[in-house]
UniProtKB/Swiss-Prot annotation:
GO terms for biological process: mismatch repair. This is DNA mismatch repair protein MutS. This protein is involved in the repair of mismatches in DNA. It is possible that it carries out the mismatch recognition step. This protein has a weak ATPase activity. One of its GO terms (cellular component) is cytosol. Belongs to the DNA mismatch repair MutS family. Signal peptide: none annotated. ATP binds at G620, P621, N622, M623, A624, G625, K626, S627. PROSITE patterns: DNA_MISMATCH_REPAIR_2. CDD domains: ABC_MutS1.
Length: 870
């Protein structure tokens, strides 16, 4: 260290404190990076890697970016999974004695980004904290850009699966965890691969209960904490607040409301269901287009867009709340003119939530204040329009709409209507607001007039026709003379600079005027900035009123958006009840019909209850529309419970507490699981957590294994749902044998997708009919999919031979009906040898399950199965 230059010593001392960050080290007009940081940044940002003398034998690797365009480079590094520490000069270099003092003023991480250029305006950027205590979890979430703070804990059931569901709900950009969690590489790997999320560790001491209680009390003084309560969310919340303080190093007073929620307060949607129903993004491409959010989002504001996403992610289960929303949507749908005027006013509303965060953090400029002014300027007109509506004014947040006329006037009187971006270059305060500003501005203008007069006078005195007076920040004001007039330069001109085609001079008179002008301008700029900061601070004090109004505007925006969609897409108002019936007339899939057009979509009816129509077994060929139909029913139920109209002629929806889906086949390579293992894990989760109030959507259960294994599993699953759970269920299958269950178990009904045969071809009619299908049409579907003709012909030959070699379908059904299946299916009932049974039983008893890896377990099961089969 002794041989290093003082600046490099300073750099390394600061870097030592932020080892996990790329350090942006301010040097003049650039942020510089050195050593390993420079090598990483030059590669990731595709900028030139150079070197700098640092006092060592070899030059230090170095690269840099201009400070005025640093945001785009920081955004790129954040998107690639890096943290960036911003190290600024914290004293004026002109006044510094020796080395300029520097320090890190902020750490930018994926979960603490506040720059709008790095954010999706209609999506929250959540930072999550997870506290793991044995198999229990505390969770806290914050969106630094809006100040929203949420927390909960998970202390019963399959806690890890519930944790995954909560992470899927919030989709955080970054997760902060305690030591036990951080050092569990398997969990970290699972999180990173499933959610593509950045994991940050924080010392265990910041998760301790006593520390966390004090931290929460410091921020949320009105929240009462019981000292001995087993509230793991307190541990997570305290740690999250500590992490924010460590990274932001500024006042975080915009985080004000401590919202503790119970997972059961809303409809529960697990990770698989969110993915399968494509609520906010498509399953494969992860695109917004093609999701339910894409269909429903006609919001006019960023705040409304984020609120709509939350409604979709967290459907309601309280009947009163659902009806209130539906009534408000209906009111806006019926009152076209009011809706149109409100939406037009909302178009002029900026993102008040995120703008107020910038105000609190001290990063808001004059244009941000003008955006706030324009936004609150719409509120009185919106409030006047809402007064004419009949819907419950509380649902419309009418009483929470504050016209904020005092805040409007604070900004309007002080800040010019079209201010520059920079706040330290003047031109931001209105004329007449401050006498001293007006005086300095006048002095500056008079000085510039004197300079213009001097230029004219000097041209006349010297005879130099193209003489001009110019200015730059290095030399100040100067007189410029081109080469051809050098001989006419007077003796009182003092040369300051020689350029290729001209020379620059000063005179005593010019210097005197310069001192007057620049002195006035410097004082003016400083005074304007002080006034701006004062105005910004006054606005900051009204943050509660502004945030409350922002939430109200967002809610109104969503209600109008849902009404607009209902009107444009011919949706109907559902009748939501507390009973167990789901009755949909001419239901349509909202996304598919949006893509192909309403005229091309074939609507279908649905009827489910807890008596004779509890389980619908749906058969039919691939590509016929079974999956689309089942997803459509689930989406209609979900839409009704967020307060939206639905794509149907009519709909009666008995509230569901959870929607489960097992749709499609996919390997979970991240967890080392096969398609069948993924399927069985999801089915196990459904059977373990579904209630009689749930809606189950199950597609092709058992297809990932052999025919008889798959059929047995599917059969047993249906029995269990019907006899043990009692949930309303849509069950699509290729196992036509399952249609016999209609005669065996009360509450099961068979349905099929209608198909029209034309010669060797088939036409999918997309209509759901009563009864089971008697043909899978596999070869015909293969032809439609583009399988070559020789393969199709050969498939037909093989199919004919297989059908001839087997007993007829009718005989098989008769045989099965003579031998009814009783009770639950036992994996050992097909083995007649008692000796094999004993061997398998003893081997199972001696197994230590806790030491088995997934691969070991599969091998053991394989060997056991061989013994059972003999």
């Amino acid at each position: 260290m002794a041989s290093l230059t003082p600046m490099m010593q300073q750099y390394l001392e600061i870097k030592e404190q932020y080892k996990d960050c790329i350090l942006f080290f301010r040097l003049g007009d650039f942020y510089e990076m050195f050593f390993s940081d420079a090598e990483v940044a030059s590669r990731e940002l595709e900028i030139t890697l150079t070197g700098k003398d640092c006092g060592l034998e070899e030059r230090a690797p170095m690269c840099g970016v201009p400070f005025h365009s640093a945001d785009s480079y920081i955004a790129k590094l954040i998107s690639k999974g890096y943290k960036v520490a911003i190290c600024e000069q914290i004293e004026d270099p002109a006044l510094a004695k020796g080395l300029v003092k520097r320090d890190v003023i902020r750490i930018v991480t994926p979960g603490t980004v506040t720059d709008s250029a790095m954010l999706d305006e209609k999506k929250n950027n959540y930072l999550m904290s997870i506290y793991k205590n044995k198999n229990y979890y505390g969770i806290a979430c914050v969106d630094l850009t809006t100040g929203e703070f949420l927390s909960t804990h998970i202390t019963f059931g399959n806690t890890f699966n519930k944790l995954m569901d909560e992470i899927a709900k919030f989709s955080p950009s970054e997760i902060v965890v305690n030591g036990e969690f951080f050092h569990d590489e398997n969990i970290k790997k699972t999180l990173k691969q499933r959610f593509d999320v950045y994991i940050s560790g924080l010392e265990d001491k910041f998760f301790e209960k006593e520390f966390s209680i004090q931290k929460v009390r410091n921020y949320f003084k009105d929240y009462v904490i019981e000292e001995n309560a087993f509230d793991l969310y307190i541990n997570a919340s305290g740690a999250l607040l500590e992490y924010l303080e460590q990274t932001q190093k500024v006042n975080l007073s915009h985080i004000q409301n401590f919202n503790v929620y119970r997972i059961e307060e809303y409809m529960i949607l697990d990770m698989a269901t969110r993915r399968n129903l494509e609520l906010t993004e498509t399953m494969r491409e992860k695109n917004r287009k093609g999701s339910l959010l894409w269909v429903l989002d006609r919001t006019m504001t960023s705040m409304g867009g984020r609120t709509l996403r939350k409604w979709i992610e967290q459907p309601l289960i309280n009947l009163h709340d659902i009806k209130d929303r539906l009534d408000a949507v209906n009111e806006f749908k019926e009152r076209f003119m009011i809706r149109s005027e409100v939406r037009e006013l909302l178009r002029a509303v900026y993102d008040i939530e995120r703008l107020m965060t910038k105000v609190i953090l001290g990063s808001a400029n004059c244009r941000d204040l003008i955006s706030i002014k324009h936004s609150i300027g719409q509120v009185p007109y919106i409030k006047e329009l809402l007064r004419d509506l009949k819907a419950d004014l509380n649902v419309l947040s009418y009483n929470e709409l504050d016209t904020l006329t005092d805040v409007y006037e604070i900004i309007d009187k002080a800040i010019v209507d079209d201010p520059p971006v920079a706040v330290k270059e003047g031109g931001i305060i209105k004329e007449g607001f401050n006498e001293e500003v007006d005086r300095l501005r006048s002095a500056s203008k008079d000085g510039k007039k004197w300079i213009a007069h001097l230029e004219s006078k000097e041209r006349e005195r010297t005879g130099i026709k193209n003489l001009k007076v110019g200015f730059n920040k290095v030399f100040g004001y100067y007189i410029e003379v081109t080469k051809s007039y050098y001989s006419q330069v007077p003796d009182d001109y003092i040369r300051k600079q020689t350029l290729a085609n001209c020379e620059r001079y000063i005179t005593p008179e010019l210097k005197e005027i310069e001192n007057t002008v620049l002195g006035a301008e410097d004082r003016l700029v400083e005074l304007e900035y002080q006034i701006f900061v004062d105005v910004r601070n006054k606005v900051a004090k009204e943050i509660n009123r502004l945030k409350t109004t922002a939430r109200s505007l967002a809610r109104i925006d969503v209600l109008c958006s849902l009404a607009e969609v209902a009107d444009r897409e011919s949706y109907t108002m559902p009748e939501v009840t507390d009973d167990d019936k789901i009755e949909i007339k001419d239901g349509r899939h909202p996304v598919v019909e949006k893509i192909i057009g309403q005229e091309a979509f074939v609507p279908n009816d649905t009827y489910l209850d807890m008596d004779e129509n509890q389980i619908a077994i749906i058969t039919g060929p691939n590509m016929a529309g079974k999956s689309t139909y089942m997803r459509q029913v689930a989406l209609i139920v979900l839409m009704a419970q967020i307060g939206s109209f639905v794509p149907a002629k009519s709909a009666k929806i008995g509230i569901v507490d959870r929607i489960f889906t097992r749709v499609g086949a996919s390997d979970d390579l991240a967890a080392g699981q096969s398609t069948f293992m993924v399927e069985m894990s999801e089915v196990a989760n459904i059977l373990g957590n579904a209630t009689s109030k749930s809606l189950l959507v199950l597609d092709e259960i058992g297809r990932g294994t052999s025919t008889y294994d798959g059929l047995s599993i599917a059969w047993a699953v249906i029995e269990y749902i019907g006899e043990k759970i009692g949930a309303r269920t849509l069950f699509a299958t290729h196992y036509h044998e399952l249609t016999e269950l209609e005669e065996r178990i009360e509450g099961i009904k068979n349905y099929c997708i209608s198909v029209e045969e034309k010669g060797e071809d088939i036409i999918f009619l997309r209509k759901i009919l009563r009864g089971g299908a008697d043909n899978s049409y596999g070869v015909q579907v293969a032809r439609l999919a583009g399988i070559p003709d020789p393969v199709i012909h050969r498939a037909k030959e093989i199919l004919k031979k297989l059908e001839d070699a087997d007993i007829t379908r009718k005989e098989k059904r008769i045989t099965r009906r003579k031998q009814p299946i009783e009770g639950q299916i036992d994996v050992f009932t097909f083995n007649a040898a008692q000796r094999s049974y004993d061997e398998v039983l003893n081997e199972l008893k001696s197994l230590d399950i806790t030491t088995l890896t997934p691969l070991d377990a599969i091998n053991v099961l394989y060997n056991l199965q061989k013994k059972v089969k003999g």
